[in-house]
């Protein structure tokens, strides 16, 4: 529900400026999300396309699942599992219910990312 003002009118924001950082490491691609407004799965696929890297080592940041429906969370979890992500550090706009589901689904590969978190690339 984000909007931009164009020619004096409010229009849905297409979020062209949504940003993420992609790092190619020896362990695979590391994706650092801002808020993933365009979708965490879309961001991962875009990272793979831009870098040519298939293996995903880590996804870190906000997944924008806080206000997502249960169906959307379930679909996102299934897609995330298909990437065989080794480390998933959720925070910010992921929300506690979705974070709990990610923790249950990813087990030891999941952590609550916060200020001061460290990860070896």
Q: What are these model-predicted stretches?
A:
Residues 116-121:
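A short acidic, often aromatic-flanked loop/helix-cap motif at beta-alpha or helix-coil junctions
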């Amino acid at each position: 529900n984000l909007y931009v003002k164009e020619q004096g009118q409010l229009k849905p924001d297409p979020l062209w400026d949504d940003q993420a950082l992609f790092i190619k490491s020896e362990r695979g691609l590391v994706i650092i999300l801002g808020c993933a407004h365009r979708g965490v799965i879309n961001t991962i696929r875009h990272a793979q396309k831009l870098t040519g890297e298939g293996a995903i080592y880590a996804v870190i940041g906000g997944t924008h699942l806080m206000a997502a429906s249960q169906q959307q969370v379930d679909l996102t979890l299934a897609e995330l599992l298909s990437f065989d992500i080794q480390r998933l550090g959720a925070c910010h706009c992921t929300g506690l219910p979705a974070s709990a589901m990610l923790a249950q689904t990813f087990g030891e590969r999941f952590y609550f990312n916060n200020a001061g978190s460290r990860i070896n690339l």
